[in-house]
């Protein structure tokens, strides 16, 4: 081993040791093993805090009180959400700069840090905010998205093809099979949460929404509906409660006054989490049911594997020059849930529910090189600001980090080295998890 390599490894190990000593115990992130160095990270980031996707007119139809207004259009990242993602970007620089992956105190080498975002305003502005937080004085950082805005980006929103038909009726049937053929069990299991939600949406026994609909969709029969592209959603009390609960979470993260968060009818975060358990259940059904996860997540997961093998495989990246070392893929909670389902992943950040894809949260795939053997390994981690950090707009640092959790990869349990999965094993797991017919050329090859 050359003196330069030995020096680099020693420096990286020293930084990792310092980081481990400075990072609070609750962070639960493993240090870089001695003799290893981090080589690449692919970070699948959810967009930050946004306004409700539905209009107030649509939401008001099913609530007894008009919903509060946001300073942006429906579905847009709010200014507060943008600020919070800049704070997260600052922490990414501290985290990955401290590990020696990227520059910590200067602009990155051209091409080594890049972001690819979905087409929505909330994803594009999230990507820009993260990069601005990482390197506020650096210009021309690669922030790209698909040039054609008239069709969905197949990385984040794959569309039906001959080899991946995404049949709506089949997806409906798969969801109903997980429900045991009817909603009876689900409605029974979530009866207390639905009653709680009904008291928030429709206090004093209100039966009509201000927009004229059935308050809380209480009188609407539960059903699974699918669109022409195979997307499924739930109608009825569970579906509307899921939407409402996530909107309450966004209100709280936005720092709205307590009398505006769920109209002041939720006293504690524990109550909010009770309501969010409905949202988690609905997301599990609509995003984690196996055929749906394979249809929606195979392209993205294959792309992650391709980027780890070759940093030039990052979307929009030139075939010449430096490979990407830190690549941000900015999408949606559905993308994270799809990948979590394919790899059987779970995590829990303090204050959130297990496996919650929180606003601005990220699932990271981190690749390490064992310098002495030349072998490569992959670890997974989840990073997210806690709800309290978002409400306080808390600056993030080694001493005051966001929530973070090492994420186990069950399929690699027998092959782990230093709690990391050998790259070749990880790639085999990815290939076994995806549906080949749902992987397009845009996902790269390895």
Label each region the model flagged.
Residues 1-5:
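N-terminal secretory signal peptides that target proteins for export/translocation
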Residues 9-20:
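Bacterial N-terminal signal peptides
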Residues 22-27:
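Sec/Tat signal peptide C-region and signal peptidase I cleavage site
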Residues 28-114, 118-327, 331-446:
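Signature for phosphate-centric chemistry
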């Amino acid at each position: 081993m050359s003196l330069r390599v030995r020096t680099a490894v020693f420096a990286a190990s020293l930084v990792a040791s310092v980081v481990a000593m400075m990072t609070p115990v609750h962070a639960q992130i493993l240090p870089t093993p001695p003799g290893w160095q981090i080589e690449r990270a692919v970070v699948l980031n959810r967009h930050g805090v946004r306004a409700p996707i539905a209009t107030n007119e649509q939401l008001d139809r099913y609530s007894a009180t008009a919903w509060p207004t946001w300073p942006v259009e429906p579905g847009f990242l709010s200014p507060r959400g943008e600020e919070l993602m800049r704070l997260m970007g600052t922490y990414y620089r501290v985290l990955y700069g401290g590990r020696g992956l990227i520059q910590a105190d200067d602009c990155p080498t051209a091409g080594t840090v890049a972001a690819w975002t979905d087409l929505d305003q909330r994803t594009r502005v999230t990507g820009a905010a993260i990069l601005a937080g990482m390197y506020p004085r650096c210009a021309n950082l690669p922030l790209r998205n698909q040039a054609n805005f008239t069709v969905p980006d197949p990385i984040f929103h794959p569309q039906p093809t001959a080899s991946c038909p995404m049949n709506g009726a089949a997806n409906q049937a798969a969801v109903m099979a997980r429900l045991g053929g009817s909603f009876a069990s689900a409605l029974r299991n979530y009866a207390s949460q639905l009653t709680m939600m009904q008291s928030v949406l429709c206090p004093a026994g209100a039966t009509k929404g201000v927009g004229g609909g059935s308050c809380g969709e209480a009188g609407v029969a539960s059903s699974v509906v699918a669109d022409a592209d195979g997307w499924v959603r739930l109608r009825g009390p569970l579906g509307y409660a899921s939407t409402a609960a996530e909107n309450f979470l966004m209100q709280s993260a936005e720092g709205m006054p307590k009398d505006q968060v769920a109209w002041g009818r939720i006293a504690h975060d524990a109550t909010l989490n009770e309501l969010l358990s409905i949202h988690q259940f609905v997301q599990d059904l609509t995003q984690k049911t196996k055929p749906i996860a394979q249809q929606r997540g195979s392209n993205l997961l294959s792309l992650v594997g391709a980027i780890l093998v070759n940093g030039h495989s990052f979307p929009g990246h030139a075939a010449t020059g430096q490979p990407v070392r830190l690549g941000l893929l900015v999408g949606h909670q559905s993308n994270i849930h799809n990948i979590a389902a394919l790899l059987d992943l779970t995590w829990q950040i303090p204050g959130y529910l297990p496996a919650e894809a929180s606003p601005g949260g990220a699932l990271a795939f981190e690749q390490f090189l064992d310098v002495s053997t030349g072998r490569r390994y992959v670890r997974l981690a989840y990073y997210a600001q806690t709800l309290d950090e978002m409400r306080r707009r808390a600056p993030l640092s080694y001493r005051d980090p966001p929530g973070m959790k090492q994420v186990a990869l069950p399929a690699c349990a027998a092959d782990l080295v230093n709690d990391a999965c050998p790259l070749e094993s990880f790639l085999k797991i990815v290939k076994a998890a995806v549906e080949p017919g749902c992987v397009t050329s845009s996902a790269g090859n390895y």
